[in-house]
Amino acid sequence: MSDLKTALGEAVEAAFAAEGVPAELARVTASDRPDLADFQSNGALAAAKRVGKNPREIATAVAGRLQGDPRLASVEIAGPGFLNLKVADAALAARADAIAADPRAGAGTVPAPRRVIVDYGGPNVAKPMHVGHLRASIIGESVKRLYRFRGDTVIGDAHFGDWGYQMGLLIGAVCDEDAEIRALVDQLNASGDPNGEIPAAFERVTLADLDRLYPLAAAKGKEDPAYRDRARKLTADLQAHKPGCYLLWRRFRDVTQVALERDFHALGVDFDWWKGESDVDHLIQPMVAELADKGLLVDDQGARIVRVAREGDKRELPPLLVVSSEGSAMYGTTDLATILDRKREFDPQLVIYCVDQRQADHFEIVFRAAYLAGYAEEGQLEHIGFGTMNGTDGKPFKTREGGVLKLADLIEMTRSKARERLHEAGLGEDLPAEEFEDIAGKVAVAALKFADLSNFRGTSYVFDLDRFTSFEGKTGPYLLYQAVRVKSLLRKAEAEGAQAGPVTVAEPAERDLVLTLDAFETALQEAYDKKAPNALAEHAYRLSQAFSKFYAACPILAAPPPVRGSRLTLAQATLRQLELALDILGIAVPERM
């Protein structure tokens, strides 16, 4: 079931080809002047240079071939050779009926589905999430849902930061603070089972403890060589699976993951894999040996590197540092081992890394090393970077005291504002308290997510809670309000026994709504190709606006039966498509407000 833009594009291509003009020039787009036409093609201007003809002459010939197309009410030529296409009311009605009957509301799927991994979130053991994790989580979740909706087999991986020197620092800090735990770690290191049950004494350790101790330990590690050396030894003991260190580390990981899952759940974010850096630790030594066997490792002042620079690079990329001069595997080494692990377990055709754009060079270096090693084919690894969420001062968002705001606090702050906004608008006040809280939570998440996803991911934006939570303007709460309004209308229609029926298109607001519904596939395709959900967010907003104008201009329940049935069908199609779009954005719609 093609959308109108695609179907008309094929017709225009055929007309161009029949005139001896390359069909690929006949691109059809939504009209820049919707007051004059629904779609346009500027191909005659590009074709004129190619075939040596006057563009208006080409456009006239193409228009003549399109005149008999029943889908078109008119084909007109404007300016030097622009083709303006206006769709017939009957064709719009047929398209609306097809969208309304389609569970996917007119959305297609990719012709060749792929196996895809989306790496996003980026949480770390011992650290509660902060506002810096918000964009990775929101954008990554939406990209995962988008690719899944288009038909790909997709795995979302949190890529848990749970290994390395910081774990040794934490083990030492916890042991220093709790003599019983220190004694138990020593005892278990001597004669324990790393796969056994976590001792009750270890269960006393909370995420708040880890969050408090880590910055102190990190600072001391920089100042005190003996403290740093002990942390390195504890890290080595952990990586050797010494039972005391390993069981305490498991407690760190478990208590962190529980808190992280709670925060992610509040945001409507979930993962298929919670794989950590620890999951690939066993691969690193054999991988390093393999890189050496392939002649990719180069000794460099005691370190071992992979050179990734290419002829023609506009700037010099440093090599991938695989093993430090001290013999330690590095951060990029773990990333490379993760690529290898994913290839063996899932063999993805595409891995998307949703990480701050400031990490672009790091990923380019790792990806090139992976291509050299044969762990992925060129182009299978892609970093989609994003900008920062800034305060009103234009700098990355912080608390009033200048500290980093925890994500849980940001969510609660937004939920509190959502409650206030609901009360101001007189919404949900007659509902049970539990339902009101659920609605406030959905409004808060919609506010945060739409504010982020309505921007192209590469741009930064200013955090403005008052604007984000408004029920007016281009906001998540506005979209929820429009969706709930359609639900209310359809419930009322059902109570009155009103039935949906075949669509007829007569009013300008009906035309605009159907054309907007038809644009869903174009928005999905753009979002998918660019890995940029803002195209879909923009469509959801335009659809909400189009329905609002239709609702104001076209009586529904008060209309005579044939017209009422048609307009109810348009309302049903709008709701389904809007809910699908919002779900891909990770936004849930309440039943009522």
Curated annotation (Swiss-Prot):
Catalytic activity, EC: 6.1.1.19
Cell compartment(s), UniProt: Cytoplasm
Chief site of localization: cytoplasm
Top EC group: ligase
Motif ('HIGH' region): 123-133
Keyword line: Aminoacyl-tRNA synthetase, ATP-binding, Cytoplasm, Ligase, Nucleotide-binding, Protein biosynthesis
Catalyzed reactions: tRNA(Arg) + L-arginine + ATP = L-arginyl-tRNA(Arg) + AMP + diphosphate
CDD domains xrefs: ArgRS_core
Domain of life: Bacteria
Entry-linked InterPro entries: aa-tRNA-synth_I_CS, Arg-tRNA-ligase, Arg-tRNA-synth_N, Arg-tRNA-synth_N_sf, ArgRS_core, DALR_anticod-bd, Rossmann-like_a/b/a_fold, tRNAsynth_Ia_anticodon-bd
GO cellular-component term (any): cytoplasm
GO BP terms, alphabetized: arginyl-tRNA aminoacylation
Any GO MF annotation of the entry: arginine-tRNA ligase activity
Family according to the record: Belongs to the class-I aminoacyl-tRNA synthetase family.
Quaternary structure and partners: Monomer.
Record's protein name: Arginine--tRNA ligase
Organism from which the protein derives: Phenylobacterium zucineum (strain HLK1)
Gene coding for it: argS
